[in-house]
From Swiss-Prot:
Effect after changing residue 15 to K: Decreased ability to trigger pyroptosis. Abolished ubiquitination by S.flexneri IpaH7.8
Covalent link location ((Microbial infection) Glycyl lysine isopeptide (Lys-Gly) (interchain with G-Cter in ubiquitin)): 177, 190, 192
Post-translational modification, as annotated: Cleavage by granzyme A (GZMA) relieves autoinhibition by releasing the N-terminal moiety (Gasdermin-B, N-terminal) that initiates pyroptosis. Not cleaved by other granzymes. Major cleavage site takes places after Lys-244; a minor cleavage site takes place after Lys-229. Cleavage by neutrophil elastase ELANE, inhibits its ability to trigger pyroptosis.
Signal sequence interval, chain numbering: none
GN (gene name): GSDMB
Record protein name field: Gasdermin-B
Amino acid sequence: MFSVFEEITRIVVKEMDAGGDMIAVRSLVDADRFRCFHLVGEKRTFFGCRHYTTGLTLMDILDTDGDKWLDELDSGLQGQKAEFQILDNVDSTGELIVRLPKEITISGSFQGFHHQKIKISENRISQQYLATLENRKLKRELPFSFRSINTRENLYLVTETLETVKEETLKSDRQYKFWSQISQGHLSYKHKGQREVTIPPNRVLSYRVKQLVFPNKETMNIHFRGKTKSFPEEKDGASSCLGKSLGSEDSRNMKEKLEDMESVLKDLTEEKRKDVLNSLAKCLGKEDIRQDLEQRVSEVLISGELHMEDPDKPLLSSLFNAAGVLVEARAKAILDFLDALLELSEEQQFVAEALEKGTLPLLKDQVKSVMEQNWDELASSPPDMDYDPEARILCALYVVVSILLELAEGPTSVSS
């Protein structure tokens, strides 16, 4: 299930840009990070591609050319172009029954109601200003954060945003029940309550981007149509996948991907397993902690070094073998887990409860059964059919539960 915030951002995109290329902000934590003139990277993950903030703006990388650049920056943004109001009123119920071999039945039901009303404004960089970004000179001394960007990834400029006009408090009433009838017992999950989120004014709900191209180390261009490489000098560049999601072919490969992730974690000692498990468990329901850990693991993967003063040292040290050499596959497995966690919202509560009660194995079996039914439907779909977001969430849930279970079960070897 999507969070209240992500539900409204998806509604905004659907109503304001149906079939277009506007991107919904997924987390309130990110609602202040994708503004006009900001530079965002594109990260390729198993669950598709997503944007991440670089912490940079155009001013950080372009040659200012005296004070002229400041005038251009001020005049480039048209400001509040228009205001809109969106009303979303939904009352829904549903039921799920799955029968497995060996007298196991999994049943579920849900009820939901939400009434959302939100006022938004549109901000965009003028087309006239964007045209001036052709063949622009870069600064001689570029920031380290720019130089450390993976040149196999693509870089984009935020050119348009939809933002809240005033503080908005959104509410959603939901009730969930999931239970299993087993020959030797049963397991149930119940949740009832009202979800609420308060969004401050001037927070970005969705945004649009244009790709930036760096033909060499001195100049930059803006790319208006289609997709290309942001760093064409790189031979091994990855193609852009903006707007793509996990497809049926990827879902069939998910088992192999998960087996690789589990395999690379099997070599951890019992102490390192506990360190990793404790660190990942802290991310459940804490998006700010998840983002911070993702950034630190990514930095270690790029530098290959461990900083002794790092607050996440127990987990980060587990990324290195006994000889002090970074095990890249292990770091990537942790990042894949954090990517999967990003797909989940309320499901994280079920995972945390199962982890606490020691019922992860049964939860894994439940999710696997429902997921395989989704795979059967995907197999009969056309190859170019977009992957169902709900099915993607189910796959992410399976990955999260499987990795936590692998870490909780104990080591099979102690080679590192």
